[in-house]
Amino acid sequence: MSSRRIASLAGLAIGMLGNTGFAEDQPHTLELESVNVTSDYQFETATSPVQGYRATRSATATKTDTAIKDIAQSISVVPASVLKDLGSNSVDRALDFAGGVSKQNNFGGLTLYEYSIRGFTTSEFYKDGFSANRGYPATPDAANIERIEVLKGPAASLYGRGDPGGTVNIVTKKPQREAFTTLQTSAGSWDRYRTALDVNTPLDEDGNLLSRVNLAVEDNNSFRDHVESKRVFVAPSFSWQLNPDTHLLVETEFVRHTSTFDRGVVAPNNKWSGVSRSTFLGEPDDDIDNDNNMVQFALDHQLNDIWSLRLASHYKQGEMSGYASESRPLSADGRTVNRRYRERDNNWHDSITQLELRGRFEGMGLEHEVLIGTEYENYRKNERVTNIAPVAGTTYAIDLYHPVYGQPKPNGARSGTDFFEHVESRALNLQDQIVFTDRLRGMVGARFEHFDQQIDDYTTNRTSGQRQDAFTQRAGLLYQLTPQVSLFTNVSTSFKPNNGLDASGNTFDPEEGIGYEAGIKGELFDDRLSTTLSAFHIEKENVLALDPSTDTNRAVGKARSQGFDLQFTGQVTEAVRVIGAFAYIDAEVTKGDRTIPTGSRILGVAKHSGSLLGVYEFQEGVLRGSDVGAAYTYVGDRSGESGTRFELPAYQTVDLLAHYKASDNVTVGLNLNNIFDEKYYERSFSNYWVAPGEPRNFTVSLTLNL
């Protein structure tokens, strides 16, 4: 990052802190609350359930419980009720309603491996403020998700290394004061079955000791031939109010997931005619096991009326192993798909500890909410991927149009990767939220991070490493034109070490980015509908992209993304709730090479995308509490392979939903998805790794309050 950019940010921060000329005589307040993880529904906090679709508070943008309308940055909150109404358990599906989020590599259907926000791809996402995607963890389960929050633009000054497009933070369900048990079971097209149980239990009469267990079991087939998955998910959590000033929260997750590794279909000559979206090009026994265990705790203590202390730690361990038959480029005959046979054996450990001091006070005639935080992370990963070639004189190919399965597995020469990666990082971050007047608010933040990475390559007996220091910053202003309408602007920087090795076995230079944003926030219809419209411009250096010639990543130089997005959520009337988004994103490589030329579109990012979900809930009569609704999703054409002309066509889908509330304790649901049976492709990595979208399908569900 250039010194001029850093200097401009520093100047803005100093100016905001030092300028008291904005002060007015009338009183002004900083609308912030301490986090109450055991709040009831009627008192929303940054971690509580959301009434309807409209969240009013978040901690993702500031790590403090802050009113969303007071945050000088775009943030989308997709509550669990959206997934419930859609009859979906997919984080990907929820992100359709965040605005400007694009689907990327899902690692053969195994993980939430990558996605894009505002044009830039990231493999980072967070759970309760902790990095949650180190290694290859299984896809997050909806059973214990309370909210999915997307902070738009760089957030490195708060979360550390990351991408400048944005940050996804999943807020998990916390123990509540009232006892309840909810059982939901569902069945759907292609023999998909799921049962989820949510048991919340106060363990003492005073409500100081609480427990909650979320459990889910899945057994799914697919519209894709021979593709199936099984999952068991258990997430116990405990909350203990030790005394009026001290609170302890312990959360755990255990996942056992097995699924068929599925890279999708092949597009012959970059076209689709004659290729069935159900055709599976692997082998029916290509199964990958993914086991994950996680435990984390957070201890909050109120030191006095001004200062509070938070100590939190997170440990995650995972293993992924199995075999896969993966497509390679199509042969000259236009129907023979070459394949490679791969064995994977990976494991990882990640431990993170955070210590934060928070204070709320007046200084220089202004109100401040200060956060001083430190973070230490120790991440270790063993990764072995073995390519097993066919013996001489044989092939391991399959016919694209008439696949025949059950070929003997290759047993020839072995090659691939085998390495140990160790990453340690230490960070100090500072943040100040400031009330200048009753209308003008500001935010400044900075983070210093030291990063050490070492990779022991067992195939070459070579050790490589990198050591990086990074200073990232963020500053923003929000001006309230009226009680319902505010203008905001911000600028922030990002830093992310590029993990892994290039084709020559060397580590990459780190990515650096800067983002600018300006927008308007509105609270409409008597504060029933929240809207945010913002324009952005983001630049990034040392962007990694897949080089098809070597099947490895490379740093292509520079990229730029700019555009605008609109998001809205609310309870428009007592009966109608809506959530929707629209985004225009112009994302391209601005400094490339022969393989990925300057001007190339960034992989998987549509210029135009939009979504809308509306639900009508009956307020009277025998249908009181029942609802009907519809969802619409549009995604424009996208680059299907870096540096080529291969594109995925635009698509649009329509879903219908209905829930019948038979009694206070029994609800029956029906979801009809892609009712017009649109044939579409939701993501790709190349023209021989293309993931088709689901055809028309249905899900029926039964929910019992026990």
Name each model-derived stretch.
Residues 134, 144-146, 157-236, 242-246, ...:
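Outer-membrane beta-barrel translocator/receptor signature
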Residues 33-179, 183, 518:
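Acidic, small-polar-rich N-terminal luminal/periplasmic segments of exported/outer-membrane proteins
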Residues 239-243, 253, 348, 367-379, ...:
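Structural signature of Gram-negative outer-membrane beta-barrels, strongest in the C-terminal barrel
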Residues 218-222, 234-302, 315-348, 392-421, ...:
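Acidic/polar loop-and-plug regions of large Gram-negative outer-membrane beta-barrel proteins
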Residues 298-314, 318-324, 487, 510-571, ...:
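Membrane-embedded beta-barrel scaffold of Gram-negative outer-membrane proteins
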Residues 298-318, 340-456:
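Face-selective signature of the C-terminal outer-membrane beta-barrel domain
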Residues 573, 633-641, 656-706:
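C-terminal beta-signal and adjacent terminal beta-strands/loops
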Residues 537, 555-642, 676, 705:
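Gram-negative outer-membrane beta-barrel transporters
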